[in-house]
């Protein structure tokens, strides 16, 4: 019996200022790396927007590149990345 290799992936947790365009910009950065988002969640707290994006089948290098680009967006305050091995 051959065991399947565990799926790699990353979860991005992003805190931003409230901005109508930020979700499209975050998703666009992931699309530029030719990846799809498996799950997304956004919570508006009236002060900030908290966004969670789960991206399967992505390696650590690409996830790091995306996180760096997210941090460069003007409205983004924090970016945390959890890499699943």
Predicted regions located by residue number:
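A conserved regulatory-domain signal marking ACT and ACT-like small-molecule sensing domains
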Residues: 1-85
């Amino acid at each position: 019996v051959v065991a399947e290799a565990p799926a790699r992936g990353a979860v991005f947790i992003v805190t931003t200022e409230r901005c109508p365009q930020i979700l499209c910009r975050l998703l666009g950065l992931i699309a530029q790396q030719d990846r799809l988002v498996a799950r997304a969640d956004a919570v508006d707290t009236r002060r900030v927007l908290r966004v969670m994006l789960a991206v399967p089948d992505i390696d650590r290098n690409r996830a790091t590149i995306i996180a760096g680009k997210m941090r460069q967006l003007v409205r983004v305050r924090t970016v945390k990345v959890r890499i699943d091995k």
